[in-house]
Amino acid sequence: MAGASVEARERFLSNLRLVNERAQVEPEIIDLVEAFARLDLEKDRPVTLHPGTPRRLSPPVEVFLEKNRHISPTSRDFLAAYCQRIHEQGQVFLLNPTHLAHLLDLSPDRLGRLARTADRRYFSYTIPKRDGSDRTIHAPNPELKSVQRLILDNILSFAPLSASAEGFRRERSIVTNGRRHVGKKVVVKLDIKDFFPSITSERIFGLFLAMGYPRSVASLLTDLTTCQGALPTGAPTSPVLSNLVCRRLDRRLSGVGVKMDFEYSRYADDLTFSSQNPGMVRLLPFLQEVIAEEGFVVKKPKTRIQRSGGQQKVTGIVVNRRPNIARKEIRILRAIIHNCKKGDIRQQASQYAASRGLGNSQDFPLSSFKASLRGKIDHVRRVNPEVGGRLLHDFKTIPFNA
């Protein structure tokens, strides 16, 4: 089956399930056999259902096997091989819904009810976007959100991500994303339309299967992390799940970049390509075709081609010669600080809130104004420590408590 198409692999797995069902194998065992075979297929390895005990076992696998030492040697060898492979992928192994319930500190019955009713446990609201349209947020209720955080911390956070992914991960930011594209003759920016809504529950289910989890576990995890058939914008699990779904997209685009000599990175739904060869823009139709094949649509009105003769910005960072903040943004911050020192701070807070759509501008709290302004200055410091340091020095002289 090595090198087989996705359709051929799924036919093989379907036949594998059918053979075991006809042999009256327990459904839970069929799930594990399919999951183990899928791990081989995902790595283009020959499928081996009698692997023997691995030579080396990680401590968590040893502990698990010790607790289940009563099972037959054949079953023990199979579970040892399966659990070790999952652990080597940087993931926690989950054999069945009861195992998942234990990890999430829920009873199996409670887990089942929570998964079945998950769609009803969200509340929706809208927030304004920069272009004037509204973004709909689907936020989980406290109980579901706490379970999603456990899924994030115990299952998703350890899964390997693409090196091209710059958003929603530790030690990466809009600054590290911008640094990858400094000093290039051409920078191309593409934006994916309806990023989270286009990642359907079917894709999430397929992701959990590809990670090696049994169908019963993958189904529960999908129900707990999707809403109305897609990734919800307000769930804590959605950002990491989007990165995991995009691993193949990232791998394909970065692979083209290696061959065609351009840099590629992705920050959430913002895709950036840069090169010293201005002719790389001729690849745009092909790149958009790859993106479409991976189930996404490019928001064409937001496509930007930036050449070295003008300002080049990547996720808000100017990248012409070195990472920097746009002069206009620095001038605005200087003006706000100056006006606060010379005039009415509360008036400045109201104007600041109104210009950014931050609720009722007349009642915008000074504490929120101070925190927001300080956050913007700290952002400048991360990109340009010298300029940011001067802004911070001036900021500290504002008489907020006067």
Model-inferred region functions:
Residues 189-193, 234, 238, 257-276:
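Catalytic palm active-site di-aspartate
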Residues 1-127, 134-136, 140-160, 165-186, ...:
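Right-hand nucleic-acid polymerase module
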Residues 213-221:
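Acidic/histidine metal-binding catalytic segments
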Residues 213, 262, 295-296:
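Short aromatic/hydrophobic-glycine micro-motifs
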